[in-house]
From Swiss-Prot:
Catalytic activity: (6R)-5,10-methylene-5,6,7,8-tetrahydrofolate + glycine + H2O = (6S)-5,6,7,8-tetrahydrofolate + L-serine
UniProt function note: Catalyzes the reversible interconversion of serine and glycine with tetrahydrofolate (THF) serving as the one-carbon carrier. This reaction serves as the major source of one-carbon groups required for the biosynthesis of purines, thymidylate, methionine, and other important biomolecules. Also exhibits THF-independent aldolase activity toward beta-hydroxyamino acids, producing glycine and aldehydes, via a retro-aldol mechanism.
InterPro entries: PyrdxlP-dep_Trfase (IPR015424), PyrdxlP-dep_Trfase_major (IPR015421), PyrdxlP-dep_Trfase_small (IPR015422), Ser_HO-MeTrfase (IPR001085), Ser_HO-MeTrfase-like (IPR049943), Ser_HO-MeTrfase_PLP_BS (IPR019798), SHMT-like_dom (IPR039429)
Subunit structure: Homodimer.
Pfam families: SHMT
UniProt gene name: glyA
PANTHER family for the chain: SERINE HYDROXYMETHYLTRANSFERASE (PTHR11680), SERINE HYDROXYMETHYLTRANSFERASE 1 (PTHR11680:SF35)
Protein name, entry field: Serine hydroxymethyltransferase
SUPFAM superfamilies linked to this entry: PLP-dependent transferases
C-alpha cells in the first residue's frame, strides 16, 4: 500500500462512486431541506491531515501529546461560534446534532424523567422523544403539536400539556416547521412549570446567525444545532449556552459522557464555516434563502397545491398533497424522475403512515448556495407543479427534465473549480 497515491489510483471503485455522486449533485436540483453545499474551503479543511490527530479532552486539557495546533484550531472554532450566536459558552465537539442532544439529556436528565417536544408527525425530530429513538425509550416523552386550522404552534395548548405533565425538559426547534419560533413564550411556559428549556435550531441556525430569525440564546438554558443545513458547514453538531458556568456541565457529557476523541478535521471545517458565516455576504445569502422559499411557496399555491401553514418564514416549504389527491411517496418518485431531489414527509394530522405520507418537504438552502434567485425558484416551482399535476404525461415529464438540466447548466455547482481543489 502506497499512502502517497491519489484516490483514483489507490481505490478507483470508490473514486468512481464519488465522481458519480458529484455528477448527480451537478445535474439535479437539490431541494432536501436538511442539505446544502459546503464551500471548497470547508471541504479542504475536513479532508486535511487533521484527520490523523487524536485529541481527547478540551483545548489545553488533552490526554494526548502533540495537540498544540489542534488546540489553536478548536479554540478558534469555539470563539467564532460564540461570536456568531452571541453565546458565552460553546462546545464544538459533537459529531452530529443527535450527539449534541444526547449530551444535553445526559447532563440534565435521569432515565424516566419527562421530556416534552413536538410530535414527529407535526414537524418534530426523532431525538425529541420519538418512541423509536433513545430519547423516547429512556425518558417519558410527551408531545405537543400544531393547531389543526393554522398548522402553527398553539401556546395555550402547549402550556396546558406542560402544566399537566410537568416535564423536566421542554424542547423547541423542529425539522419541518416553516414558521418563526417564539422562544420567549416557551421560556415563560418553562419557568411556570420549572423545566429546563432547550432549543434545537439545526434547521434554522444559519438564519439565526444572520439575525433573520429570533435568537434562542437569551431565552433557552441550552441550544443545540447541526453545522450543515442553513449554516453551510460540515456535517456535525454544536452546543451553545448564554451561561458559561452552566455550559461547562455539558463538556463532560460530550467527553467522556457520549463520545471519545473529537474529529479535529471536522472541527477545523466548522471553524472555517463559522468564519464564513461571520462575513456580511452570508447575511445576503440567508436573506436570499428566505426570499426564494417565499417565491417557491407562492408559485405552488398559485398552481393549486396546498402549503402547510399557508407559506413559510424560513427555508422550508412543506407541501400538503391531499389537495391534489397524491401521497408523498408518489410525489417523491415523480420529482426524482425529472432530477429533483426532495423527500416525502408527514404533514400535521396526516392520515398516511410515515412510509407513505401526505407531504413533500422542500428547502431552498442548497440551490441558493448555487446562485438561484427568485426568478429561478419561480421556474423550479412551475416545474414541480407541472410534474405533480400531470403524473402520467410522458411529454411533460421529458420537458420538465430538460428544464431542470437547463437550470443546472445556468447555475453550475462550484463553477467547475472542484476538480482543481482535490488533485
Amino acid at each position: 500500500m502506497n499512502i502517497l497515491q491519489n484516490l483514483k489510483d489507490s481505490d478507483p471503485v470508490i473514486s468512481n462512486f464519488i465522481n458519480s455522486e458529484k455528477n448527480r449533485q451537478e445535474t439535479h436540483l437539490e431541494l432536501i431541506a436538511s442539505e446544502n453545499f459546503a464551500s471548497i474551503a470547508v471541504m479542504q479543511a475536513q479532508g486535511s491531515v487533521l484527520t490523523n490527530k487524536y485529541a481527547e479532552g478540551l483545548p489545553q486539557k488533552r490526554y494526548y501529546g502533540g495537540c498544540e495546533f489542534v488546540d489553536e484550531i478548536e479554540e478558534l472554532a469555539i470563539n467564532r461560534a460564540k461570536k456568531l450566536f452571541n453565546a458565552n459558552w460553546a462546545n464544538v465537539q459533537p459529531h452530529s446534532g443527535a450527539q449534541a442532544n444526547a449530551a444535553v439529556f445526559l447532563s440534565l436528565l435521569k432515565p424516566g424523567d419527562t421530556i416534552m417536544g413536538m410530535d414527529l408527525s407535526h414537524g418534530g425530530h426523532l431525538t425529541h422523544g420519538s418512541p423509536v429513538n433513545m430519547s423516547g425509550k429512556w425518558f417519558n416523552a410527551v408531545h405537543y403539536g400544531v393547531n389543526k386550522e393554522t398548522s402553527e404552534l398553539n401556546f395555550d395548548e402547549i402550556r396546558e400539556i406542560a402544566l399537566e405533565t410537568k416535564p423536566k425538559l421542554i424542547i423547541c426547534g423542529y425539522s419541518a416547521y416553516p414558521r418563526t419560533i417564539d422562544f420567549e413564550s416557551f421560556r415563560n411556559i418553562a419557568d411556570e412549570v420549572g423545566a429546563f428549556l432547550m432549543a434545537d435550531i439545526a434547521h434554522i441556525a444559519g438564519l439565526v446567525a444572520s439575525k433573520l430569525h429570533p435568537n434562542p440564546i437569551p431565552y433557552c438554558d441550552v441550544v443545540t444545532t447541526t453545522t450543515h443545513k442553513t449554516l453551510r458547514g460540515p456535517r456535525g453538531g454544536l452546543i451553545l449556552c448564554k451561561d458559561a458556568e452552566f455550559g461547562k456541565k455539558f463538556d463532560k457529557s460530550v467527553f467522556p459522557g457520549t463520545q471519545g476523541g473529537p474529529l479535529e478535521h471536522i472541527i477545523a471545517a466548522k471553524a472555517v464555516a463559522f468564519g464564513e458565516a461571520l462575513q456580511p455576504d452570508f447575511v445576503n445569502y440567508s436573506q436570499q434563502v428566505i426570499k426564494n422559499a417565499k417565491v417557491l411557496a407562492s408559485t405552488l399555491i398559485n398552481r393549486g397545491i396546498n402549503i402547510v401553514s399557508g407559506g413559510t418564514d424560513n427555508h422550508i416549504v412543506l407541501l400538503d398533497l391531499r389537495s391534489i389527491n397524491m401521497t408523498g411517496k408518489i410525489a417523491d418518485l415523480l420529482v426524482s424522475e425529472v432530477n429533483i431531489t426532495a423527500n416525502k414527509n408527514t404533514v400535521p394530522f396526516d392520515p398516511e403512515s410515515p412510509f407513505v405520507t401526505s407531504g413533500l418537504r422542500l428547502g431552498t438552502a442548497a440551490l441558493t448556495t448555487r446562485g438561484f434567485n427568485e426568478n429561478a425558484f419561480e421556474e423550479v416551482g412551475e416545474i414541480i407543479a407541472d410534474r405533480l399535476l400531470n403524473p402520467n404525461d410522458s411529454l411533460i415529464e421529458s420537458q420538465c427534465k430538460e428544464r431542470v438540466l437547463s437550470l443546472c447548466n445556468s447555475f453550475p455547482l462550484y463553477e467547475g473549480k472542484l476538480e482543481a481543489s482535490i488533485k
